[in-house]
Amino acid sequence: VPEKSNLPMIYVRSKPKDHGQGRQIEGVLKPGQKTVLIDDLISTGGSVLKAVKAAQKEQAEVIGVVGIFSYQLTAATKNFAAAKIPFATLTNYRELIEVAQQSDYIDADDLQLLQAWRKDPQNWQ
């Protein structure tokens, strides 16, 4: 994305390195720099919101998060709202199971199981 848009790129680790300079963020991040973080998968938003905090600690202005896929969990919506960070994804769980059903990868029983998981993944059995 940065190469195609001719914008700078940083890489945010889940925690600072325990060797070398001990950086959590690689790349040039200037104070006040508008920043959008990109993540592959958003479930609760926890990991990418830690990256947001790391960038904010370096005085970046995080204007949003973009993900490739979201499970659309209520926890993610609440966590992003609490952090006051907007987020969007290219696709999501609802669209995935819709396409899977239309393509005959899943049947009606599978659909019910997938929808039940989506309603309460922590307690699903």
Show where each model-derived region lies.
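Short, glycine/charge-rich flexible loops or terminal/linker lids adjacent to PRPP-binding catalytic cores
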Residues: V1-T35, T44-K50
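Residue-level preference for alpha-helix termini and adjacent loops
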Residues: D18, Q24, V28, L41, ...
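Short, Lys/Arg-enriched charge-dense amphipathic segments
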Residues: P2-S14, T35-I38, F87-N92, L114-K119
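A contiguous pocket-lining binding segment that forms or flanks enzyme active sites
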Residues: V28-S70
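PRPP-dependent phosphoribosyltransferase catalytic core
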Residues: K53-Q125
